[in-house]
Amino acid sequence: MNNETKRTRLTVQDMVRLSVLVAIMLLLELTGLGMIKTAGLEITIFLVPVIVGAIVMGPGAGAFLGGVFGCISFWECFGKSWFGTMLLGINPVFTFLVCVPTRILAGYLCGLTFKALHKLDKSNLWSFGAAGLIGALCNTVLFMSMLCLCFYHTEYIQGFVAALGSSNAFLFVIAFVGVNGLVEGAVSLITGAAIAKAVMYSRGKLAARKTNA
């Protein structure tokens, strides 16, 4: 009976945490802080709550929060994002595929990665940062792969290809992501991992693990 109560309580706690993270993502969207634009860069902050949820609550939570991120991204295609608006005008279905499933899978893979790495990281030193970095990498790779699959041969994307001087899809991805991808990776590695680790300490998970070790 106690075990069942404990499992129920943990489930409720996770639902509360998910609600808080979703609220943070919506707040980021409403305030315009979810996408920081400066010096030609667009740094995605939405990925941080996804990474935190994936690390703290597992792949399922990561997938759910990734879905929220994807839906917000798709919503921005209706006027807020000039790039997304152009894609939506070309093909709405493909635009949805670029925005939503890629983020769901990125969140899921981030949680799955942390689950695997954390078993090896007995010192709790590197698994958080590695999962955050891989989460950002998965988001970028999946997004750009779907973008190329769905839109690479369109006149709009070919305009970018010509402007960047890319001779193939791979070089286009490298040139298009560039410094932006590196900065997002650093933000996810440092911020997402640090917050997730702090939350897990507050839950007593890491402390209990060290005691058992």
PLM region spans:
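Loop-helix junctions at membrane interfaces
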Residues: 1-213
